[in-house]
Each structure stands twice: as C-alpha cells, then as structure tokens.
Regions:
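Generic secretory/membrane-interface signal
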Residues: 7-8, 18, 139
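A positional/architectural concept
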Residues: 13-75
C-alpha cells in the first residue's frame, strides 16, 4: 500500500490510500486475476474520481474500478500460500459436504454456483469445484454444470499459479490429482 499525496488538489481526499500499485496483480470477482495497468483520474457525470485500470489476464477485457469502490466491488489481493493450503483442504474434504446439491433442480444449482463464482471469494469457488466434482461422480453433468466447473477450475488455477509462481499446467495437475484422490 502507498498513499497518494497532493496530485489532485481541490478534491479534498488527496490522502486516500491506494491498495494496488501499477504493475501488480489483483483479483476481480468473476474475471479472476487482473493486472493494474494504470491509475487515472476520470470525470464521469460531472464527478472526478481516481480509477484503477485493470486488464484481465489472458483476455482482451479492461475494467475501470473507482479506487474508493474497490473494496465494495470485491477487488482483492491475490491469495497467500497459506490460503492455498486451505483451498486444497476444501477440495480434499468430502466428509463435510452438505449434500452436493444433487437433489436440487439444475437451474437452482446453476444460479447458486454462478453467484458463488461472482462473489470473488476464492474459498466459495473451491467449494463449487468440489461440489460439482462430487456431483459428477453421482450423475452426468449438464452442459451448464460443466461450464461452471470449468470456470471454477480456471479461476482457481490462474490465481494459485500466480500465488505459487508456477505454470498453470502444474497447478491444473495438482488440482486434478486432489480431486481424483478425493473421490
């Protein structure tokens, strides 16, 4: 973190704390890992604010987030190595699973899982992957469930690979091994 000083005299909040530095990686809900490309002042609807300009990794998508709303929209730092251990424990643990939602309609499960992916909570994403993995052992997955599973896996793999400084293929193999041995 660093403080911004004096750059925008007259705004009254020049000393606001900026949590993300240009060039650093962060996580934006539902999009996954992003890189902070710039911090720019923009006037929108007559209000001047500072924005993070975020580029989604492995995508052409650019997102602008007001700095003062960054926390409320769920922009967060990439997970730590100790949090990776917690994610792997979630993926391994099959005994605590409340029924993997197999008895619910596909639409209800899909909405529930989508909401968890959009939350930006990496542990919820891990639960979604684990639940769908268990569900696929009991029945054939629908196309939508397969898409949700792929999205959850992708979000986990990208963030863990950044946190561990490993190639995505290595992390995918780690997660596949955990899911295969947890069945």
């Amino acid at each position: 973190m660093f403080s911004r000083s004096g750059a925008n005299s007259g705004m009254g909040d020049n000393d606001k704390t900026i949590m993300f530095k240009v060039g650093k990686k962060a996580v934006y809900p539902a999009h996954g890992v992003v890189q902070v490309k710039a911090i720019e002042s923009k006037e929108i609807y007559g209000t001047k604010k500072d924005y993070y300009i975020l580029e989604v990794i492995d995508s052409d998508v650019t997102v602008m987030v007001p700095i003062d709303n960054a926390e409320s929209v769920g922009l967060r730092h990439v997970i730590s190595k100790s949090q990776i251990t917690r994610i792997y424990k979630i993926l391994k643990n099959t005994s605590k699973v409340e029924q993997p939602n197999g008895h619910q309609s596909w639409n209800k499960r899909y909405r529930e899982y989508s909401d968890k992916l959009k939350s930006g909570d990496i542990f919820e994403v891990a639960h979604v992957l684990k639940d769908i993995n268990l569900l696929q052992n009991a029945k054939d997955l629908s196309f939508g469930e397969k898409r949700i599973m792929d999205s959850a896996l992708s979000l986990l793999v990208k963030e863990i690979s950044i946190a561990k400084n490993l190639k995505e293929e290595s992390v995918t193999k780690e997660i596949d091994k955990i899911l295969t041995t947890s069945n």
